[in-house]
Amino acid sequence: MIEADRLIAATGPREREEIQDRAIRPVSLADYIGQPSVREQMELFIQAARGRNESLDHTLIFGPPGLGKTTLANIIAEEMGVSIKSTSGPVLERPGDLAALLTNLEPHDVLFIDEIHRLSPIVEEVLYPAMEDFQLDIMIGEGPAARSIKLDLPPFTLVGATTRAGMLTNPLRDRFGIVQRLEFYSTADLATIVSRSAGILGLPLDPEGAFEVARRARGTPRIANRLLRRVRDFAEVRAKGHITKPIADLALNLLDVDERGFDHQDRRLLLTMIEKFDGGPVGVDSLAAAISEERHTIEDVLEPYLIQQGYIMRTPRGRVVTRHAYLHFGLNIPSRMGDMPVVDEFLDAVDD
């Protein structure tokens, strides 16, 4: 399975969707909906940095895909009144790639590195003195004639984004003065986002229709906006373009997105655990083989939302479905589950 092929994928949009996404992205903290703690803190930090005429401290933003890490990075640059240069960890293959970006920054500019956990060790080593001392150490020549020279860099702000904060090395993580975690959005916040996007795109949308789209969007703005575009297609063809709750419900059912925001892949994972592994515990490798998926697809794509919603637990012995999964499919809850610990006790447990 390719994550980008899922309608409810939280990965980046396709090229055509990306153009529309840029039009509906907020460009200031005042327009930024949700994440109240992050918004309040960043407003404070930015105001303080501007008052001192300094660069904002290096900032790490982490959380599940589609929650607005790139959007927040662009807002930081906009609020600071500086330019932003964007790249990603896999693109920076050699130290020279990073050096070219750093030497072209203006004072107080923002350098945004997405997927920063995928930086190669050799590039990461070059980044340390740049972050700490605003200096670039580069090697000139080869062999015995090689020598190191230092280049002074203008003060800048590195904004790193990652979905896998645990994969960052300690030296890199410790160099970020500001660390922000983005959480899944509430349905109310997503409904506000959907209504705002519909207004920008000129779509007639009832509040109840916005809420219906929002509650199936898995707590993720990117998914909410993608579902809105598909519901718009349905409404334009079959409902004269007006999106109401019944129209949104019909459209999303047609698109195989159920009331919990699950699609076919989510339901297949849960049913496989119930029917083939008696609800678990089951190891992730066995589960991957059973549904013909890669291990990382289960860990990075399918599991996070199911765990966050309490449908799957990670235990030291493997994955286990909860009673919520049985209830979702209208199945009888096994009697043995009456003795199971409360779901919340396991939500943060990690297995192999």
Swiss-Prot record:
Pfam annotation, one family: RuvB_C
Sequence positions that bind ATP: I24, R25, G66, K69, T70, T71, E132, D133, F134, R175, Y185, R222
Molecular function (Gene Ontology), one example: four-way junction DNA binding
Binding site for DNA: R295, R314, R319
InterPro entries to which the protein is assigned, alphabetical: AAA+_ATPase, AAA_lid_4, DNA_helicase_Holl-junc_RuvB, P-loop_NTPase, RuvB-like_N, RuvB_C, WH-like_DNA-bd_sf, WH_DNA-bd_sf
CDD domains xrefs: AAA
Catalytically driven reaction(s): ATP + H2O = ADP + phosphate + H(+)
Biological process terms in GO annotation: DNA recombination; DNA repair
Top enzyme category: hydrolase
Chain segments carrying region Large ATPase domain (RuvB-L): 4-185
Small ATPAse domain (RuvB-S): annotated segments: 186-256
Keywords in alphabetical order: ATP-binding, Cytoplasm, DNA damage, DNA recombination, DNA repair, DNA-binding, Hydrolase, Nucleotide-binding
Positions contributing to Mg(2+) binding: T70
Region described as Head domain (RuvB-H): spans on this chain: 259-352
Any one GO cellular component localisation term in the record: cytoplasm
Enzyme Commission designation: 3.6.4.-
Domain notes: Has 3 domains, the large (RuvB-L) and small ATPase (RuvB-S) domains and the C-terminal head (RuvB-H) domain. The head domain binds DNA, while the ATPase domains jointly bind ATP, ADP or are empty depending on the state of the subunit in the translocation cycle. During a single DNA translocation step the structure of each domain remains the same, but their relative positions change.
Role summary: The RuvA-RuvB-RuvC complex processes Holliday junction (HJ) DNA during genetic recombination and DNA repair, while the RuvA-RuvB complex plays an important role in the rescue of blocked DNA replication forks via replication fork reversal (RFR). RuvA specifically binds to HJ cruciform DNA, conferring on it an open structure. The RuvB hexamer acts as an ATP-dependent pump, pulling dsDNA into and through the RuvAB complex. RuvB forms 2 homohexamers on either side of HJ DNA bound by 1 or 2 RuvA tetramers; 4 subunits per hexamer contact DNA at a time.
Oligomer status and interactors: Homohexamer. Forms an RuvA(8)-RuvB(12)-Holliday junction (HJ) complex. HJ DNA is sandwiched between 2 RuvA tetramers; dsDNA enters through RuvA and exits via RuvB. An RuvB hexamer assembles on each DNA strand where it exits the tetramer. Each RuvB hexamer is contacted by two RuvA subunits (via domain III) on 2 adjacent RuvB subunits; this complex drives branch migration. In the full resolvosome a probable DNA-RuvA(4)-RuvB(12)-RuvC(2) complex forms which resolves the HJ.
Family recorded in the similarity comment: Belongs to the RuvB family.
Protein name: Holliday junction branch migration complex subunit RuvB
Organism: Pseudomonas fluorescens (strain ATCC BAA-477 / NRRL B-23932 / Pf-5)
The organism's taxonomic lineage, starting at the top: Bacteria, Pseudomonadati, Pseudomonadota, Gammaproteobacteria, Pseudomonadales
GN (gene name): ruvB
